[in-house]
Each structure stands twice: as structure tokens, then as C-alpha cells.
Amino acid sequence: MRILGIDPGSRKCGYAIVSHTSNKLSLITAGFINITTTRLQEQILDLIEALDCLLDRYEVHEVAIEDIFFGYNPKSVIKLAQFRGALSLKILERIGNFSEYTPLQVKKALTGNGKAAKEQVAFMVKRLLNITSEIKPLDISDAIAVAITHAQRLKPH
């Protein structure tokens, strides 16, 4: 099963596709969608086109999105909500459903501590997937962490 993890952002949207088979996780690809245009409508279209390409290329079965963190200023929260709404609609059209995880849930799933620093999450991502190289920017490791969190929820108890 292929899981797409998404860490939405107003400038960079982190993504990761993780394979989950027989209780084994492996990273297929990860990166970020760089949002460079200035008009909101163009930004949303660029984001959706990039998502479409990922869904086409990697035959994703499940999608998990990190919830918006509300510590930002109100303008940023509104913009992120618009991006997230557009992403959600496209995912519903293409996949049919998606799961959402708060930053606290993701941090707790990977480190055991809901207040862990991003660097601790990145360390655990590398450890769980046997990645030796650095994962930069942290938007990418966050997206991988979202996909891993979802995979852990899919495991039989």
C-alpha cells in the first residue's frame, strides 16, 4: 500500500510517499512543492497540479494530511486553510477519502512525546526508515512523519 503524507504550508508543501507492506515501511519519494507565484489563485492551481502529478505517477492508495497549526498569524491561517481546502477537494475527487493528524498526534506517534521538536521527529523518521542522508527542509521530514503515523494506524492491533 502506498501512503501519501502531506505537510501543507503557505510557501512549501512537504510531501512523502511511503510504502507499507507486511508491517515494513519504506520511503518511495519525498520532497516539497515550492509555491512561488504571488496570486492566491495561481498558488492553489500550482499546488493542485503538483498533487495531481504525484497521484498519477505513484498510484497512491491512502492520503494523510497534517492539520493546520494555529500558532500562526490570522492571515497565514486563512491562506493555509484555503490551500488545505483545495488539497482536500482534489484528494476526495481522486482517492475518495483522507485522514487527518494533528502535529501533536504525529510527534507522539514517532517520538512518544507530543511536544517533541521538529528535529527529534526528523531523527526518528531517519531511524525508522533507515535513511542516512539529511532530510531538508523539515517540511519533508514532517510529511514523511505524517505518512508513517498513518501507516501505524493501519497496522492490526
Swiss-Prot record:
UniProt keyword annotations, A-Z: Cytoplasm, DNA damage, DNA recombination, DNA repair, DNA-binding, Endonuclease, Hydrolase, Magnesium, Metal-binding, Nuclease
Biological process per Gene Ontology, one example term: DNA recombination
Any single Pfam family the record assigns to this protein: RuvC
EC number(s) recorded for this UniProt protein: 3.1.21.10
Xref: InterPro entries: RNaseH-like_sf, RNaseH_sf, X-over_junc_endoDNase_Mg_BS, X-over_junc_endoDNase_RuvC
Main localization category: cytoplasm
Keyword Glycoprotein: no
A GO term, aspect molecular function: DNA binding
Function in brief: The RuvA-RuvB-RuvC complex processes Holliday junction (HJ) DNA during genetic recombination and DNA repair. Endonuclease that resolves HJ intermediates. Cleaves cruciform DNA by making single-stranded nicks across the HJ at symmetrical positions within the homologous arms, yielding a 5'-phosphate and a 3'-hydroxyl group; requires a central core of homology in the junction. The consensus cleavage sequence is 5'-(A/T)TT(C/G)-3'. Cleavage occurs on the 3'-side of the TT dinucleotide at the point of strand exchange.
HAMAP family: RuvC
Quaternary structure and interacting proteins, as annotated: Homodimer which binds Holliday junction (HJ) DNA. The HJ becomes 2-fold symmetrical on binding to RuvC with unstacked arms; it has a different conformation from HJ DNA in complex with RuvA. In the full resolvosome a probable DNA-RuvA(4)-RuvB(12)-RuvC(2) complex forms which resolves the HJ.
Name by which UniProt lists this protein: Crossover junction endodeoxyribonuclease RuvC
Originating gene: ruvC
